[in-house]
Amino acid sequence: MRELEERILKDGRVLPGEVLKVDGFLNHQVDPDLMFAMGTEFAHLFQDAGVTKILTVESSGIAPAVMAGLAMHVPVVFARKHKSVTLIDDLYTAEVYSYTKKTSNHISIAKKFLQADDQVLLIDDFLANGQAVQGMFEICDKAHVKIAGVGIVIEKVFQTGHQLIADRGVRLESLAQITSFDGDRVHFASEDTQA
């Protein structure tokens, strides 16, 4: 998605450890117009997948997931990282390691929000090593739902997450695919297709 790539080049910042900081429009301050465009693009990409529900992990996956849900007219469920006093129902849980925060979290979803006949689209802000997606796969497996696909805002194709999804035979659509960082320069897969 060219608009997203341009925004990454304009406002993103490469940090040590191959971390891309995009807090100016995605995961701290949110640009609603860009989010709407991303949600619309996800809806277009998965229009024939029979999606009945969207699943994400709090918190940075919520905005793109909600915009996709709005465009697709389906509910959005987000896995909570911290158990609240209101989260008392039977739960599906999984452990997820955060690449950027270097911590593990238990994510939880109330069982009543995932039914065996659901076709679930997983959406997240980043795909690096695939730990958040792996946690969502685990929850979907426990709920016996069909995974319609995975939608990622920004994918680092040089890390292991892509292969993790491919090994499951699940369709993956990423709006921006980063092939490498060169100092503070970001290189996209779309550059290779334009050459």
Swiss-Prot record:
Subunit: Homodimer.
Family, per entry: Belongs to the purine/pyrimidine phosphoribosyltransferase family. Xpt subfamily.
Annotated residues for binding of 5-phospho-alpha-D-ribose 1-diphosphate: A128, N129, G130, Q131, A132
Keywords from the named record: Cytoplasm, Glycosyltransferase, Purine salvage, Transferase
Gene that specifies this protein: xpt
Protein name: Xanthine phosphoribosyltransferase
Source species, domain of life: Bacteria
The organism of origin for this protein: Lactiplantibacillus plantarum (strain ATCC BAA-793 / NCIMB 8826 / WCFS1) (Lactobacillus plantarum)
Physiological role: Converts the preformed base xanthine, a product of nucleic acid breakdown, to xanthosine 5'-monophosphate (XMP), so it can be reused for RNA or DNA synthesis.
GO cellular component: cytoplasm
Pathway: Purine metabolism; XMP biosynthesis via salvage pathway; XMP from xanthine: step 1/1
